[in-house]
Amino acid sequence: MANSAQARKRARQAAKANSHNSALRSKFRTAIKAVRKAVDAGDQAKAAELFKAAVKTIDTIADKKIVHKNKAARSKSRLAAAVKGLQAAA
């Protein structure tokens, strides 16, 4: 347990940041899963719509450094390829 006032405050701040960042990471994963689900279902219009929303979410979370920018870019690239593959198959 933290003994000094400064250490107690830092512990409170760390817990608050961890809670907030966990929620954002969850939002990141949920956005990716939603696009994947639409692609697997073969719903081209919904996949494109969800992809656009997912890109916005992914970029926001990468800007806040919740996930690394390279991981964000890789996720967007893979989702784009999946959506494009769905359009090519149609």
From Swiss-Prot:
SUPFAM superfamilies assigned to the protein according to its UniProt record, in alphabetical order: Ribosomal protein S20
UniProt keyword terms in alphabetical order: Ribonucleoprotein, Ribosomal protein, RNA-binding, rRNA-binding
GO biological process terms on file: translation
Secretion signal span: none
GO annotations of cellular component type: cytosol; small ribosomal subunit
Any one GO molecular-function label of the UniProt entry: small ribosomal subunit rRNA binding
Recorded superkingdom: Bacteria
UniProt-listed Pfam families: Ribosomal_S20p (PF01649)
Region (Disordered): 1-25
Gene3D superfamilies attached to this UniProt entry: Ribosomal protein S20
Family per record: Belongs to the bacterial ribosomal protein bS20 family.
Cited function: Binds directly to 16S ribosomal RNA.
Protein name: Small ribosomal subunit protein bS20
Lineage start: Bacteria, Pseudomonadati, Pseudomonadota, Betaproteobacteria, Burkholderiales
Gene name for this UniProt entry: rpsT
